[in-house]
């Protein structure tokens, strides 16, 4: 469970890097499928990007971990993602 939350934070930090304006809109859709979609919809979203079997398998493992989180937690992670991604602070470097 901690791995899934850690991965969510990592993905958000990638989105909110100084290059976030160049982030593919499809990435946000994949993130939504990761937290709110079915395993098959998430896998289909990943396949669109031709990740190769190792990366596809890793993504599927991540989805299985995320699915062990309570629904409310997954919904709150999506809300947190939206708050972070729409914040004017998103483009600032938050490294400590």
Curated annotation (Swiss-Prot):
Keyword Secreted in annotation: yes
Gene3D superfamilies according to UniProt: Secretoglobin (1.10.210.10)
Cellular compartments per GO CC: cytoplasm; extracellular space
Record's signal peptide: 1-21
GO molecular function annotation: phospholipase A2 inhibitor activity
Location in the cell: Secreted
Keyword Signal carried by entry: yes
Pfam families reported in the protein's UniProt record: Uteroglobin (PF01099)
Alphabetically ordered keywords of this record: Disulfide bond, Phospholipase A2 inhibitor, Secreted, Signal
GO BP, sorted A to Z: signal transduction
Subunit architecture: Antiparallel homodimer; disulfide-linked. Interaction with LMBR1L is controversial.
Record PANTHER family: SECRETOGLOBIN FAMILY 1 MEMBER, UTEROGLOBIN
Function, in words: Binds phosphatidylcholine, phosphatidylinositol, polychlorinated biphenyls (PCB) and weakly progesterone, potent inhibitor of phospholipase A2.
Family recorded in the similarity comment: Belongs to the secretoglobin family.
Protein name, as recorded: Uteroglobin
Gene responsible for this protein: SCGB1A1
